[in-house]
A protein has these predicted regions:
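Acidic, polar-rich low-complexity tracts and alpha-helical solenoid repeat scaffolds
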Residues: 1-131
Length: 131
């Protein structure tokens, strides 16, 4: 019984790793559309967010939780930066919301400096937009 349980956890870890690598691939592709005949800036960032968030829901106790959450924050931020002006402000606000969620869940993260920089930049944009 214990052996079966351990095997299940081991296989779940492999599935989480696969999901993380898929989300990271989408993130790394960024706004690249390849040979596509239509322009869909940010689509890969959105795919990264969806993939990572699904993995977080499906495997809430994963060791990759922090990495997946950071990937969501980065992807939302980069998507916001590349957004058209009409959507940029809302997407920067989503980035700020994601920052607070990350900071609450991982207050001791080794990525805090990067996360703080994302927050400062997003806040600056939102503040400039409100003036």
């Amino acid at each position: 019984r214990d052996e079966a349980q351990n095997m299940i956890f081991e296989l779940q870890d492999k599935l989480v790793e696969k999901e993380y690598l898929s989300a990271k691939l989408y993130y790394d592709l960024g706004s690249y559309t390849g040979n596509s005949s239509y322009s869909s800036t940010g689509n890969n960032y959105l795919a990264a967010v969806v993939t990572a968030e699904n993995a977080l829901k499906e495997y809430p106790y994963s060791k990759k939780r922090e990495d997946l959450s950071l990937l969501v924050l980065r992807a939302k931020y980069d998507m916001a930066k590349e957004s058209v002006d009409e959507k940029k402000s809302d997407r920067m606000r989503e980035t700020i919301d994601e920052y607070y969620a990350f900071k609450n869940e991982f207050p001791e993260s080794k990525h805090l400096k990067e996360v703080e920089n994302i927050f400062k930049d997003a806040s600056k944009y939102v503040k400039d937009d409100e003036e």
